[in-house]
A protein has these predicted regions:
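Conserved adenylate-forming
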Residues: 2, 10-13, 22, 31-40, ...
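Hydrophobic alpha-helical scaffolding
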Residues: 16, 56-59, 79, 83, ...
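Conserved pre-ATP/AMP-binding loop-to-beta segment of ANL
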Residues: 50-68, 74-75, 85, 97-105, ...
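Conserved G/P- and acidic residue-centered "switch" motifs that form tight phosphate/ATP-binding loops
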Residues: 72, 129, 193
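Conserved AMP-binding/adenylation subdomain of ANL enzymes
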Residues: 87-105, 115-157, 172-176, 235-236
Length: 268
């Protein structure tokens, strides 16, 4: 972890690094390997004396931030996102992908350093002036049912997760939980950031149907850090559409030949 952070800081020429108190030990190790002007917690920076600084308005083609890729196939790369590109993607997500209204409310446990959390659940509700509730990612990993509790109590309408998040919730649910949640408000349960596996998603929908969860709320999404976040959304209110194909033909010839769902040689 320290090695990866060091390489990321070096690759972008960072001068300052900020971390919560819980991660300062890592940052102190990093500072021994990377030449930084200053490191510290947000509270450390708040204590610095203020100075008058004149800011010039940024042009549309100037950088807004660096978004690092997931690093699933190689070392994370910093993608430079300019001002106009991020605003365009935010508009497309709000207007066309999710078709947001003033009645929507976001709920998220996604980490802020990931494009799905940063763009989808911080910047989108921010520019749309919509309410959002946040659950720390670590807390979700330990107590995933809190995610459902927040959606239920605050009448959340938009919430996303990779497939594993839905699978984790379904695994931790008990029959006695069904009376605790009302998920009828959840209209867009986006799925992305990893392979969209229909098996755990169907289990999630079946387990939470007594709580008012509608399987048609599932929205398969595809995104890339290089494109800010969203590349495509499945249509809203239709749920998942799954094609079953012959796995051998797909892997050897690239042919999507229909196959029986229950066959041992089937890929979804």
């Amino acid at each position: 972890y320290v090695g990866q952070i060091s390489r990321m800081l070096e690759s972008c020429g960072a001068a300052i690094a900020v971390a919560p108190a819980s991660h300062m030990g890592f940052l102190e190790e990093v500072s021994e390997q990377v030449d930084l002007v200053m490191t510290g917690t947000p509270e450390d920076f708040d204590q610095l004396p203020e100075k008058e600084v004149e800011f010039s308005p940024l042009r549309p083609d100037e950088p807004a931030y660096l978004q690092y890729t997931s690093g699933s196939t190689r070392f994370p790369r910093g993608v430079e996102i300019d001002q106009s590109t991020v605003l365009d993607n935010l508009h497309e997500i709000a207007e066309h992908g999710l078709k947001l209204t003033h009645q929507d409310r976001f709920v998220s446990w996604l980490p802020y350093y990931h494009d799905m959390g940063l763009i989808g659940f911080i910047l989108v509700p921010l520019i749309c002036q919509l309410s959002a509730d946040y659950l720390p990612s670590r807390t979700f990993a330990m107590r995933p049912r809190l995610w459902l509790k927040i959606i239920s109590e605050n009448r959340g309408t938009i919430s996303s997760s990779p497939t594993f998040g839905y699978a984790l919730c379904a695994k931790r649910l008990r029959p006695s939980d069904y009376d605790k949640y009302d998920l009828s408000s959840w209209r867009a349960a986006c799925v992305g950031a990893e392979q969209v596996n229909p098996v755990p998603l169907k289990a999630f929908a079946e387990n939470l149907a007594p709580c008012g969860f509608d399987e048609n709320a599932f929205v398969a999404c595809y995104g890339m850090a290089e494109c800010v976040l969203a590349v495509s959304f499945a249509p809203l209110d239709l749920g998942l559409s799954v094609d079953y194909v012959d796995q051998d033909l797909m892997s050897t010839q690239g042919l999507a030949a229909p196959a029986d769902e229950n066959s041992t040689n089937t890929a979804a």
